[in-house]
């Protein structure tokens, strides 16, 4: 059987790098989609040597740039006959950043990278995924969405294109959590729209994991100290990479779509209650997610905004 093709964004460090190594070791043809080609070339060689698999390719991609995504998808479809697995792993979180950062299309950088970029890539590669016998998409989510158990927490749809630039300070963690909540909402809608084409779409809720040196190097002094301290007890990225592999390849998830899966590989259910003790249980547990994610009005808002900004309607 011809090797299956897996595309992983942000595959040059952390979980993405570990996942690329896992898939390569298992004999898959791996396409690393990365922004920093200097670092990524060295990582690619490292993965080839460790996996004994020469079918590890590298393509340049900036997930925050729509132009880069369009160029990448065009080049990918010209080079590969199909796509079997698409993993939206790349993410943006600038720890402690107090200034709003915008993408080349003037979209808040967290949302451009974590939400609108994956949406556009999925839209452009859907026809190539459809050529696979068992196409699967996995979106990397986060436990940060648990902040939405607070009924006051909402995505600020009026602050995604620099509307408050220079008017108030940016909260990097809020924007990161909001963008990942939006990605989860897109997961459910993508699963619905792509189901007739046989494409399964799920999300993995990533909890604690040891941060890479590359990630820590970008932080300010305070966050560096905190990250190094947390790394003493955080598990290695390889554990979460194993989850990527299992969800995207095993028969257990062959017919699963439109689900959020936790680090124990259990399907998470929407919360039935977000008040009192139930809210505390939800925040510290891993069995439920905020029902904000399935509210049809919110889902329609982010879906329509994605179509409008990416001009894919």
Name the predicted role of every residue range:
Residues 97-99, 132, 149-151, 215-216:
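Conserved catalytic-core motifs of eukaryotic protein kinase domains, centered on the activation segment
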Residues 79-80, 96-98, 124-133:
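A short helix-coil junction within the Rossmann-fold of NAD(P)-dependent oxidoreductases
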Residues 122-123, 188:
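A short, exposed helix-loop element centered on a Lys and neighboring polar residues
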Residues 115-116:
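Ankyrin-repeat alpha-helix packing hotspot
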């Amino acid at each position: 059987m011809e090797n299956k093709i897996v595309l992983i964004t942000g595959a040059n460090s952390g979980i993405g790098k570990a996942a690329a190594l896992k898939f390569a070791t298992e004999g898959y043809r791996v396409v690393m989609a990365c922004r920093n080609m200097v670092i990524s070339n060295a990582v690619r060689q490292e993965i080839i040597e460790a996996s004994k698999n020469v079918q590890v390719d590298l393509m340049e991609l900036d997930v925050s740039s729509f132009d880069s995504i369009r160029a990448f998808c065009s080049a990918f479809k010209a080079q590969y006959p199909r796509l079997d697995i698409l993993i939206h792993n790349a993410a943006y979180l600038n720890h402690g950043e107090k200034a709003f950062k915008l993408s080349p299309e003037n979209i808040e950088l967290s949302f451009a990278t974590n939400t609108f970029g994956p949406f556009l890539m999925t839209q452009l590669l859907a026809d190539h995924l459809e050529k696979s016998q068992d196409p699967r998409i996995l979106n990397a989510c986060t436990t940060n969405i648990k902040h939405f158990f607070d009924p006051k927490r909402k995505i600020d749809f009026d602050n995604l294109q620099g509307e408050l630039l220079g008017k108030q300070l940016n909260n990097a963690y809020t924007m990161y959590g909001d963008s990942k909540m939006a990605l989860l909402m897109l997961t459910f809608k993508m699963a619905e729209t792509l189901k007739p084409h046989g494409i399964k779409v799920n999300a993995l809720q990533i909890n604690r994991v040891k941060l890479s040196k590359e990630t820590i190097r970008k932080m300010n002094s305070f966050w560096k100290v905190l990250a190094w301290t947390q790394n003493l007890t955080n598990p290695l990225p390889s554990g979460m990479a194993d989850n990527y592999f299992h969800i995207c390849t095993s028969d257990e998830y062959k017919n699963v779509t439109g689900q959020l899966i936790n680090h124990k590989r259990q399907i998470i259910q929407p919360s039935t209650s977000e008040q009192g003790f139930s809210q505390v249980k939800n925040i510290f547990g891993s069995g439920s997610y905020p029902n904000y994610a399935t509210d049809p009005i919110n889902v329609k808002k982010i879906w329509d905004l994605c179509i409008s900004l990416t001009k894919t309607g």
